Regions:
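A fold-wide structural signal in alpha/beta-hydrolase
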Residues: 8, 34-44, 82, 113
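Active-site glycine-rich loops that stabilize anionic/oxyanionic intermediates
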Residues: 13-18, 165
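Conserved alpha/beta-hydrolase "acid-adjacent" motif
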Residues: 168-175
Length: 178
């Protein structure tokens, strides 16, 4: 049976604006972690036209809040959890791990580990398009306007980051900025 008070993982797949990778990246990763004995949760966050007003980042916050509030029911620790994320999901997870806009701002425990698979560091050339489509007329800070590496501090959670040298998607998104 399941043990109580285990470390858990929250898995966040990427997306291609209107298509989610929650099955390919999220569920498949979750299954492998589950097979290794880890309690695991997969986040389905808002994408496409539903991603305005920092919705994807807020979805990460709400997921960690929910898991934290129900830790006893799930048999998990509230501290030292891991976030495993991919692509654009890696960008919002990465921002959640920061002091500036992440967990601290919501009174949540700091992630114990960040596993960022080919995360988007910046939406550079897409920023104006995202702003027009998602938040027209809004000049406030939005996740898609943030360059993740600008928010990394010495207190950032321990991180394992990987990407493929021949990743054509990141190459089309201004490779040198990723």
């Amino acid at each position: 049976g399941a043990q109580a008070n285990q470390k858990y993982a929250l898995v966040i797949g990427g997306n291609a604006i209107v298509v989610s990778a929650e099955i390919r990246e999220g569920i498949s990763t979750a299954w492998n972690l589950h097979e290794m004995g880890y309690p695991v949760f997969v986040l389905r966050y808002r994408i496409g036209m539903k991603a305005s007003n920092n919705a994807p980042l807020q979805d990460v916050v709400r997921a960690v809040q929910y898991i934290t509030e129900h830790a006893g029911q799930f048999g998990v620790q509230v501290e030292d959890y891991a976030i495993v994320s991919y692509s654009s999901g890696g960008q919002i997870a990465g921002l959640f791990g920061t002091d500036a806009v992440g967990y601290k701002n919501y009174g949540l425990p700091k992630p114990g580990a960040m596993l960022l698979g080919y995360p988007v560091n910046t939406f550079l050339e897409f920023k104006p398009v995202y702003n027009i489509l998602l938040d027209p007329g809004v000049c406030k800070q939005r996740y898609y306007k943030m360059t993740l590496s600008d928010y990394i501090t010495p207190d950032y959670p321990p991180t394992y980051h990987w990407y493929g040298k021949n990743d054509m998607t990141l190459m089309t998104m201004c490779w040198s900025a990723q």
